Amino acid sequence: MSDEPALTCDGFDDAIIGVTVHQPGRQSVVVYDAVKMIEILMRRDGMTYEDAEEFLSFNTWGAWVGAGTPVFVHHVPEGEPVAEFLCETFGDDA
């Protein structure tokens, strides 16, 4: 296991859904529910869903801050093909 600490996102403890170990290096990382993070910004900061999603996408989900960078889970809606979800959520490069 890595000696680096697992990093957290300030103000989003209620969106933590677990921890996992990132390979290689066996670094423990915190796992967040992306939709819960959006809901926190909507409730706390009065953002719309779209504004919160854009803010998190630009400022948080795409950031790399070292080996302890958290993981953000985006749930695939039931019945939606994974490839379609990836394209809609992350663009054509996914």
Region spans (language model):
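C-terminal alpha-helical interaction appendages
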Residues: 1-94
